[in-house]
Regions:
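Conserved glycine-rich Rossmann-like NAD(P)H-binding loop of the short-chain dehydrogenase/reductase
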Residues: 29-41
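Strand-loop microenvironment adjacent to phosphate/nucleotide-handling motifs in alpha/beta enzyme folds
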Residues: 143, 147-342
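N-terminal Rossmann NAD(P)H-binding glycine-rich loop of SDR-like oxidoreductase domains
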Residues: 5-27
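Conserved Rossmann-fold cofactor-binding substructure of NAD(P)-dependent oxidoreductases
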Residues: 55-76
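Hydrophobic/aromatic anchor residues within beta-strands of the central parallel beta-sheet
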Residues: 56, 96, 159-162
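Rossmann-fold scaffold of SDR-type NAD(P)-dependent oxidoreductases
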Residues: 10, 71-80, 121
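Conserved Rossmann-fold NAD(P)-dependent oxidoreductase catalytic core, especially the SDR/UDP-sugar
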Residues: 79, 83-139, 143
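Conserved residues in the N-terminal Rossmann fold of short-chain dehydrogenase/reductase
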Residues: 36, 58, 98, 192, ...
Length: 342
């Protein structure tokens, strides 16, 4: 389905966008356009891969004109551009609105105008029952693409989304932070050891995107099932892998943190389709005439439950270590650390 097609990746220099790019470089895709504001990272990618399929566009999703320029002749869009740090969004919520909500509106408007075939919008577990500015902005982003999907024909532009949990070892995540502190001999700072988080690899996340490209219908949110761990057990697993004795320091929760993350709300779980390794949350396609819905009701919601990092499979320390060792980043860091200790 990707042969001789043009794919645009917004936020293409980030961890997620970069992983998607690498996946499609091995396909028969015609061209991959990397759209981001970071010219240094674009130059790094250009030099690293030296691949004629890669085309680079400097711009910001906040600027509709730069988006429109990059969108010409595009067949597929993977929209990953966002602000990703919860505390930063708490202190600058309007910036989160500009990038995550308005930026998504700009991408979708341009995609519709350019007759793009399919758009995948990247969301996060923080969008389900959100309590922080990043999660609220992502939840609104989901509302934007679902609303857009209601108002256009899927034969013209199919718009859907993916919602993922914590991507292990992605830029700005806790695993690189813990490893840096282990190497520096510093205490591992933990906000709350009993917090749970979903654990997905970048490869898992890319598989979710490919699954959405192949199977999602307009307005859908696709979710991949994932195990979780407590933050305390994750720190312990890394210390055991590195055979380190760093102290663990409890510093208390940061701005906007939740005890557990939710991938599906109770209301979504009642309506979702179980696809084996994935859930498909269909769009609420009702119009504003609720008379029939009020008469018939929906008893499924009262019998449903949310799918969160507390009630999925919670990994043991040994299972976490096995999962960590599947990550090339962790293996490389571990080898370097052991070599330095000889």
């Amino acid at each position: 389905m990707f042969d001789d097609k043009i794919l645009l990746i917004t936020g293409g220099t980030g961890s997620f966008g970069n992983a998607v790019m690498k996946q499609f470089l091995d396909s028969n895709i015609k061209e991959i356009r990397i759209f981001s504001r970071d010219e240094k990272k674009q130059d790094d990618i250009r030099k690293k891969y030296n691949n004629s399929k890669l085309k680079f566009y400097i711009g910001d999703v906040r600027d509709s004109q730069s988006v429109e320029t990059a969108m010409r002749d595009v067949y597929y869009v993977f929209h990953a551009a966002a602000l990703k740090q919860v505390p930063s969004c708490e202190f600058f919520p309007v910036e989160a609105v500009k990038t995550i909500i308005i930026g998504t509106e700009n991408v979708l408007q341009s995609a519709i105008h350019q007759n793009v075939k399919k758009v995948i919008c990247l969301s996060t577990d923080k969008a389900a029952y959100p309590i922080n500015a990043m999660g609220i902005s992502k939840a609104m982003m989901e509302k934007v693409f679902v609303a857009k999907s209601r108002n256009i024909r899927s034969e013209q532009t199919l718009i859907c989304g993916t919602r993922y949990g914590n991507v292990m070892a992605s830029r700005g995540s806790v695993i690189p932070l813990f490893i840096d502190k282990i190497k520096a001999g510093e205490p591992l700072t933990i906000t709350d050891p009993d917090m749970t988080r979903f654990l997905m690899s970048l490869e898992d996340a890319v598989e979710l995107v490919v699954h959405a490209f192949k199977h999602a219908e307009t307005g859908d949110i696709m979710v991949q099932k994932a195990p979780s761990s407590t933050v305390g057990d994750l720190a312990t697993a890394l210390l055991e892998l590195f055979e380190a004795d760093n102290a663990i320091e409890i510093i208390g929760t940061r701005h906007g943190e939740k005890k557990a993350e939710t991938l599906l709300t109770r209301e979504e779980y009642a309506q979702c389709e179980d696809m084996g390794d994935y859930f498909r949350v269909p769009a609420d396609s009702r119009d504003l005439n609720y008379s029939n819905y009020v008469e018939t009701g929906n008893e499924k919601i009262t019998q449903s439950y949310e799918y969160n990092s507390d009630n999925t499979h919670i990994l043991t320390v040994e299972e976490i270590k096995e999962k960590l060792l599947t990550l090339e980043y962790v293996r490389n860091e571990l080898n370097d650390y052991k070599a330095s200790m000889r």
